[in-house]
Amino acid sequence: MSDRTPPLIDCHTHTGFSDGTSTFEENVRAAAARGCRVMVASDHLTLPASMDPLCEASVAEADLPAHRAAFEAARALAAELQPALELVYGFECDWYEGCEGYVERWAAGAAVRLGSVHWLGPAGIGGATGAPAGDMAGAPHGWIDDSGDMHLWEELGADGIWRRYAATWCRACESPLAFDVMAHPDLPARFSREGWAPTGDLAPLWDEMAACARDTGRRIELSTAALRKGIGDYYPSAGLLERFVRAGVPVTFGSDAHRAQDVCHGIEEARRHAWRAGYRTFDMPHADGSWETVALG
C-alpha cells in the first residue's frame, strides 16, 4: 500500500431503535471523533411479528417515522461537528422467504440497504400484519445468531447450518431486492469457537457463495464484528474473502457497531487485510444512494 490514507468509512452501525445501545447522536459524535468520512446508519429493518414479536431486534413499524426524524437530527449535528462527515440513511434488511414486499415498504427512503441472513427456514408470514402462519410448525426454522436459543444448531448440527445458510445466502443474493451490500457473509462462524465448528470442508460452499455474489452483482462487507466476538478472523474469513477477490466481487467495510465505542472499530486494519487478500479498491456510499470506488492505497 502507498502512504496515501483512504477515507475512513463505516457502512454498518446500529442504535437503540433496533438492537443497539447507543443513540444516533452518540454514534455521530464517535464517528466525528475518529475522523470518519462516511457512516451508514443501518438499524435492523422491521420484521414480521412471527420473527420478532416484541420488536426486540428490529425497528418497530410504528417507530419508523421517529427513527427517520432522529436520523435527520443527527445528520444536522454531524454537519456542525464535522462537515466532512457524511451520514447515510440505511437499514440492515434480513432476507427470509416472502420478505420482498415488506422490505420494499419498510425500507422506503433508505439510501443503503444491507442484505443479511440471520434466520433459516419458514418465516411464518401470514399476511399483511406478519401474523404467524401454519408453515412455522413444519420445517426447522429460527435464528442462527442467538446464543440464548441454539435449538436450530442442536437440531441441524453445524454442518447442516452451514449448508442451509449458504443456500439461503445465495437466494438472498438472487433476490430482486436492491441490496447494496451483503453483510457479514459467513455469519455461522459466530459460534465456531463455542463447540459449533463445522466438521466438513466449507470450500465448496464458499465457491458457490463467491460465484453467486459475482453473478448477481453484489458487494460484500468486510466486517470487523467477528474480531469482537473472539473468532480470530473477519467476516468473511480469509478463505471466503480470497474467493470473493478472485471472483471480482467489490468490497466495503463495516464495524456492525451496536455501541458508539465500536463505531469504526478496526476499519484501518481491515483495509490492510483487504489489501493483503488482493483487493486494490473498495466501494464507498453516499447519502444520495450513489457509490464511489476508492483506491485502497
Q: Where would I find each of the regions flagged by the language model?
A:
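Conserved, mostly hydrophobic/aromatic
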Residues: H12, A31, R113, H184, ...
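A structural motif
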Residues: C36, A110, L177-F179, V249, ...
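Hydrophobic residues within beta-strands of alpha/beta enzymes
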Residues: M39-A41, R113, M182, I220, ...
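Active-site-adjacent C-terminal substructures of enzyme catalytic domains
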Residues: L202-V263, R280
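Mid-to-C-terminal alpha-helical segments outside catalytic/metal-binding sites
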Residues: D262-G297
